[in-house]
Swiss-Prot record:
The gene is infC. Keywords: Cytoplasm, Initiation factor, Protein biosynthesis. This is Translation initiation factor IF-3. GO terms for biological process: ribosome disassembly. It comes from Anaeromyxobacter sp. (strain K). Residues 209-222 have a biased composition (Pro residues). It is found in: Cytoplasm.
Length: 232
């Protein structure tokens, strides 16, 4: 039985609900395994009910008077709760910060390639750090770095907003861009529209194929003309 084999200390840490012999109340209000109300029972009788079903008695509302307990398979309950938590974590969006490094005089092809990468990264709801690196005497021409960053802002205006304005840090000038909320909302709207349109476009599952229309009957052959020679 579940009660006989369960550690009386619970083994689940202080956050676990009290189960079985750990329940201290003398009387408890019991909810059955199917959600039915069993009323207020002495703790020994409630434990016996759970044991008959091979389940646990779990204190679900300890502050109630009397405490509310439910008969359930507590091990399975904990497993399902853990599974739900893991699935919720998978659905959480993890925002990453990708850095793209430029020079005050970056070649046009290199610039275009990196801007495309930043655009794609922002489209995935991530952030981007755009860094302009100065070398040697370039430090005396910081305005070139400002021009580069301003160009980036203009080129990505439709997909990005400035989260951290351009500033110097040592021999680098950088800014941080975040995804444009309007762009993200547009993506969500398009995804919803596509999902809604998909079932309508797909043929109904199991629907019989339409019966082809019968081919028109061939016309009857015309009677042969009488031979004049035969009539003589």
């Amino acid at each position: 039985m579940a009660i006989q084999h369960r550690d009386p200390r619970g083994g689940g840490g202080s956050r676990d609900a009290r189960t079985n012999r750990r329940i201290k109340a003398r009387e408890v209000r019991v909810i059955g395994a199917e959600g039915e109300q069993l009323g207020v029972l002495p703790i020994d009788q409630a434990l016996a009910r759970a044991q008959e079903l091979g389940m646990d008695l779990v204190e679900v509302s300890p502050m109630a008077k009397p405490p509310v307990c439910k008969i359930m398979d507590y091990g399975r309950f904990k497993y399902l709760e853990k599974k739900k938590q893991n699935e919720a974590k998978k659905k959480q969006v993890v925002v990453q910060l990708k850095e793209v490094k430029l020079r005050p005089r970056t070649e046009e092809h290199d610039y275009d390639t990196k801007i495309k990468k930043v655009r794609a990264f922002l489209g995935e709801a991530n952030k981007a750090r755009i860094t302009v690196m100065f070398r040697g005497r370039e430090m005396s021409h910081r305005e070139l770095g400002q021009k580069v960053l301003q160009r980036v802002i203009e080129d990505l205006r439709d997909v990005a907003v400035i989260e951290s304005a351009p500033r110097m840090e040592g021999r680098q000038m950088f800014m941080i861009l975040a995804p444009n909320p309007k762009m993200l909302q547009s993506q969500r709207d398009k995804a919803k529209a596509a999902a809604a349109a998909a079932p309508a476009a797909a043929p109904a599952a199991g629907a019989p194929a339409p019966t082809p229309a019968p081919a028109p009957a061939a016309p009857a052959p015309a009677p042969a003309a009488a031979d004049p020679a035969a009539q003589r």
